[in-house]
Curated annotation (Swiss-Prot):
Record keywords, A-Z: Endosome, Membrane, Transmembrane, Transmembrane helix, Transport, Vacuole
Assembly information from the UniProt record: Interacts with PRA1F1, PRA1F3 and PRA1D. Interacts with ACD11 and BPA1.
Transmembrane regions listed in the UniProt entry: 65-85, 87-107, 123-143, 145-162
GO cellular component, one term: endosome membrane
Free-text tissue specificity from the UniProt record: Expressed in hypocotyls and trichomes.
Keyword Nucleus set for record: no
Domain of life the protein comes from: Eukaryota
Family: Belongs to the PRA1 family.
Species this chain originates from: Arabidopsis thaliana (Mouse-ear cress)
Lineage of the species this protein comes from: Eukaryota, Viridiplantae, Streptophyta, Embryophyta, Tracheophyta
Function summary: May be involved in both secretory and endocytic intracellular trafficking in the endosomal/prevacuolar compartments.
Residue ranges the record marks as coiled coil: none
Name of the molecule in the record: PRA1 family protein F2
């Protein structure tokens, strides 16, 4: 029996839902990259001085890690990428794992449902972490990856300790208040 003139029903999700998911992912990636600070500001050599002491170094590290968080993440990923160029299998496996992390953990708004069961974020985090460790062990590039991550961490900590943080503003309101108070202050006699 045929149904002429009937509107066909589709068994796959509509393209509008797919486009919505892609645009939401694009928005999250853009908002994450929007926190990136200018590289010129990060590597301003006039702002590089040795800290006065241990607590000054700790204070600088905390401030700079918060301020340059996206820049440091890009730098760490770049160092990791460079270290995996000589291990193409590991690079492919790591790329697949990054896609899993992005879509199953970072870009997911609603809870993950598998076979009708709702899985919480902690379970997804543990599962992805175990999968990542197992895959890194299977590719025999674990020492290379750990070495590159250790190198990147040391470089980030050195930069964060040496980069002065007194001229950084975590939000635009603080910058405006400081500029206004600087313009309105009068020298005391």
């Amino acid at each position: 029996m045929t149904n002429y003139g009937a509107i066909p029903t589709s068994s796959h999700p509509s393209p509008a839902i797919d486009l919505e998911y892609i645009s939401r992912a694009k928005h999250r990636i853009k908002s994450g990259l929007a926190t990136r600070r200018p590289w010129k500001s990060m590597f301003d050599f006039e702002s590089m001085t040795l800290p006065h002491g241990f607590f000054d170094a700790i204070s600088r590290i905390k401030t700079n890690l918060g301020y340059f968080r996206a820049n440091y993440a890009i730098g760490v990923l770049f160092i990791l990428f460079l270290s995996l160029l000589y291990h193409p299998t590991s690079l492919i496996v790591l790329s697949i794992l990054v896609v899993f992390w992005i879509f199953l953990y970072f870009l997911r708004d609603e809870p993950l449902v598998v076979f009708g069961y709702q899985i919480d974020d902690r379970t997804v985090l543990i599962g992805l972490s175990v999968l990542t460790v197992v895959m890194l062990l299977l590719t025999h590039a674990t020492s290379n990856i750990l070495g590159s991550l250790l190198t990147a961490a040391v470089l980030v900590l050195i930069h964060a300790a040496v980069r002065r943080s007194d001229n950084l503003f975590l939000d635009e309101e603080a910058a405006a208040v400081t500029e206004a108070s600087g313009l309105m202050s009068y020298p005391s006699s």
